[in-house]
Amino acid sequence: MPRRREVPKRNILPDPKFGSQEVSKFVNVLMTGGKKSVAERILYGAFDQITQKSGKEALEVFTLAISNLRPVVEVKSRRVGGANYQVPVEVRPARRSALAMRWLRDAARKRGEKSMGLRLAAELIEASEGRGAAIKKREEVHRMAEANKAFSHFRF
């Protein structure tokens, strides 16, 4: 790692439709190849689907899903005396949200529905209810940290 000055955090503008910074960040996570308008169309379409299917406010479902997906602990590899140990470490708040959004996107991409909007809507609804592939991923990470609790004294 370079020992230069710390890079300042970029200020992400809130999303124009919902006025939420979290939605804006998720659009950026969803975006591929710099096509932001396509990512926005997909997300807003998913939000419309959520409102139709669940009858709840789409933004509420989204924030609940993200908060359900945030991991508390994760494991990091650390080399000690010729052996690699999976050391459980607490996740920083900014990274919690970033991981939750990435897991949500990846889980939605792996689903079987026809369009990405439908996949994302279904995954968001499931995550807000505490089930689905993204929740499974978070549980798996927590399980790994629990299993390697014995190595927690190898702090970073």
Swiss-Prot record:
To which species is this protein native? Answer: Methylobacillus flagellatus (strain ATCC 51484 / DSM 6875 / VKM B-1610 / KT)
* Top-rank taxon, per record: Bacteria
Explain the purpose of this protein.
Answer: One of the primary rRNA binding proteins, it binds directly to 16S rRNA where it nucleates assembly of the head domain of the 30S subunit. Is located at the subunit interface close to the decoding center, probably blocks exit of the E-site tRNA.
Tell me the gene name: rpsG
GO MF term list:
rRNA binding; structural constituent of ribosome; tRNA binding
Q: Does the record bear RNA-binding in its keywords?
A: yes
Cited Pfam families: Ribosomal_S7
A GO cellular component entry from the record: small ribosomal subunit
Q: Which UniProt keywords apply?
A: Ribonucleoprotein, Ribosomal protein, RNA-binding, rRNA-binding, tRNA-binding
Q: Does the keyword Ribonucleoprotein apply?
A: yes
Q: Protein name, please?
A: Small ribosomal subunit protein uS7
Q: How does it assemble?
A: Part of the 30S ribosomal subunit. Contacts proteins S9 and S11.
| CDD domains attached to this UniProt entry | uS7_Bacteria (cd14869)
For the biological process aspect of GO, one term held by this record is: translation
Family per record: Belongs to the universal ribosomal protein uS7 family.
